[in-house]
């Protein structure tokens, strides 16, 4: 879900944030 962040953070912020 996210590159730098975890899957949970990827859904909230985005694939980069």
Curated annotation (Swiss-Prot):
Keywords: Amidation, Neuropeptide, Secreted. GO terms for cellular component: extracellular region. This is Pyrokinin-5. The modification Leucine amide is found at residue 17. It is found in: Secreted. InterPro entries: Pyrokinin_CS. It comes from the Eukaryota. Belongs to the pyrokinin family. Its main location: secreted. GO terms for biological process: neuropeptide signaling pathway. Myoactive. One of its GO terms (molecular function) is neuropeptide hormone activity.
């Amino acid at each position: 879900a996210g590159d730098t962040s975890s899957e949970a953070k990827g859904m909230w912020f985005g694939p980069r944030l």
